[in-house]
Amino acid sequence: MTVTTIHEQLLEIITPVIRSFDLELWGMDFIQGGKAVLRIYIDGPDGVTIDQCATVSRHIGLALEVEDIIAGAYNLEVSSPGLERPLFSAAQLAAYKGHKAELVLRAPCAQFPGRKKFTGVVGNVEGENFTLQIDPLKGGDNLQEELSAHWDDVKKARLIYDFDSEKGQKR
C-alpha cells in the first residue's frame, strides 16, 4: 500500500471520529520506518483541552484497531497544534497573513539558489500561490526580499509565535 493510499484511508477513519466531538482535524503526519508514528493535530473554536485530546486518542485508537491499516507497531499522538502550529495547506497559511512563519521548501528555488529554509511574514495568498516577506539573513545585507512560491513546493511550514509581543501585557 502506498503512503498516499494509507494517508487517505487514515483521513477517512479519523476525520469522522474527530468531528463527532465537535472538533476539527488541523493536520496529520504519518511517519513510517522503525516504529511508525501517527501524529494528529486537532483544534476547536476555543482550542482543545488535554482531556479532549485523550478522549479523541482513545476513540481513534479503537477505530484504527478495527480497520487495521497500519502494519506493525506504531505510536499514536493526538494534540493541539499549539502556538507554533504546523501548517498543512495554503488555506491555513492564508488565515495567518501578517504573521511570522517558517517554511522549508522541497528543493531550492530559482529565486534563491541553494536555499530551502525561509523565515518571514506571510504576505498574499491566492489559491495555492503565496508570498513571504523574508527576514534578512544574519551577516547579510538588510534588504527585505519576497519569496513567491506554490504550496506544492513546501515540504514543511509552521507559525512562529512572537513571545516578546506578550511582554508587559496584562493577562
From Swiss-Prot:
Cellular localization per UniProt: Cytoplasm
Domain of life, per lineage: Bacteria
SUPFAM superfamilies: YhbC-like, C-terminal domain, YhbC-like, N-terminal domain
Main location: cytoplasm
Signal sequence region: none
GO biological process: ribosomal small subunit assembly; translation
GO cellular component: cytosol
Swiss-Prot/TrEMBL keywords: Cytoplasm, Ribosome biogenesis
CDD domains: YlxS_C (cd01734)
UniProt xrefs under Pfam families: DUF150_C (PF17384), RimP_N (PF02576)
PANTHER family, A to Z: RIBOSOME MATURATION FACTOR RIMP
Task performed by this protein: Required for maturation of 30S ribosomal subunits.
Family under the similarity heading: Belongs to the RimP family.
Protein name per the record: Ribosome maturation factor RimP
